[in-house]
């Protein structure tokens, strides 16, 4: 499954740890004041991935589609 993750630059370490824990494959990325990473998550790990996103208002995920 493909997701976009939007986050503030100061949350970079949190997001990178989440991606590492979920064996996410990074595709496109933009690192600026506001950051975006497109990732692929194995379908078997989507629930774990979605629940691992902390309830921080500066981190948001968006399901893009299946791949």
Place the predicted regions along the sequence by residue.
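A structural signal for short, well-ordered beta-strand segments
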Residues: 5, 37-39
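Short glycine-/aliphatic-rich beta-strand segments at the starts of folded cytosolic domains
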Residues: 1-11
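Terminal, non-globular segments
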Residues: 39-42, 46
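A broad, low-specificity signal for short, low-complexity segments enriched in glycine/proline
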Residues: 1-2, 22-25
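Conserved short beta-strand edge segments in small beta-sheet-based binding/regulatory domains
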Residues: 25-31, 56-67
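Short amphipathic alpha-helices in soluble, non-transmembrane regions
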Residues: 15-20, 48-57
């Amino acid at each position: 499954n493909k997701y976009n993750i939007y986050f503030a630059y100061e949350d970079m370490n949190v997001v990178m740890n989440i991606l590492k824990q979920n064996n996410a494959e990074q595709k496109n990325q933009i690192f600026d004041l506001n950051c975006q990473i497109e990732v692929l998550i194995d379908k078997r790990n989507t629930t774990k991935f979605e629940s691992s996103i902390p309830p921080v208002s500066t981190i948001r995920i968006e399901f893009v589609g299946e791949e």
